[in-house]
Amino acid sequence: MIERTFVGENVSETLIDEYFKTKLVRAGYSHIDFKKTPIGTRITVFAEKPGFVIGRKGKMVKELTETLATEYSVKNPQIEVKQVENPDLDPAVVGHKIASSLERGMHFRKTAHSAIRRVMGSGAKGVAIIVSGKLSGERSRTEKFMDGYMKHCGEPAEALVNKSHQLAKLKLGIVGVTVKIMRPDVSLPDEIVISSGEIKEVSEISEVSQE
């Protein structure tokens, strides 16, 4: 019974997270933090632009609160809004900006290079950006852009690397954008890095469209 309740809560949080992603696009939405209290549920929303989450005269935050209570059955939801400390070190915010740029017609390579420079300029130990889909033709492919130090597997990758996945809707189809950032404050025992400042690129053809 406890396990079923735990799974149900996780599913609910995932659905709410997806709802906020869609609803708070202009706010530079990052993530949410749930905490149950004796009088209800406190939900902390982290975003690049808190003002857009609150809305004019609190209109948006009231709408979000009502939706959580009526459509997601959250008991007495209380929304708190916090600003992301450094948007260029937040993979969700970085990924959203990349996706938005792609939707506006910016070239994926230029967009990724620009994002990597901002991330590394903010002090990140390393960054990886993976863009997958029909980027410039009928062939779907995967482009990877990396700089600095990055753990790709094992416990360090899970504990020290922040990740996010966003979607960009282009004329050719849906393009996935994955961002991985190694935070500035991490300390690794095997770290010996001499960074040249050169962004590495890897291109892979993943499938061929039959259309």
From Swiss-Prot:
Entry GO MF terms: rRNA binding; structural constituent of ribosome
Disulphide connectivity of cysteines: none
Matching Gene3D superfamilies: 3.30.300.20, Ribosomal protein S3, C-terminal domain
Superkingdom of this protein's organism: Archaea
The UniProt record lists the keyword Cytoplasm: no
Gene Ontology CC: one annotated term: cytosolic small ribosomal subunit
Record GO biological process: translation
InterPro entries the record matches: KH_dom (IPR004087), KH_dom-like_a/b (IPR015946), KH_dom_type_2 (IPR004044), KH_sf_prok-type (IPR009019), Ribosomal_S3_C_sf (IPR036419), Ribosomal_uS3_arc (IPR027488), Ribosomal_uS3_C (IPR001351), Ribosomal_uS3_CS (IPR018280)
SUPFAM superfamilies tied to this protein: Prokaryotic type KH domain (KH-domain type II) (SSF54814), Ribosomal protein S3 C-terminal domain (SSF54821)
Keywords for the protein's UniProt record, in alphabetical order: Ribonucleoprotein, Ribosomal protein, RNA-binding, rRNA-binding
Residues annotated as domain KH type-2: 16-85
Family stated for the protein in its record: Belongs to the universal ribosomal protein uS3 family.
Complex and partners: Part of the 30S ribosomal subunit.
NCBIfam families recorded: PRK04191.1, uS3_euk_arch
HAMAP family membership: Ribosomal_uS3_A
Described purpose of this protein according to its UniProt entry: Binds the lower part of the 30S subunit head.
Protein name: Small ribosomal subunit protein uS3
Lineage: Archaea, Methanobacteriati, Methanobacteriota, Methanomada group, Methanococci
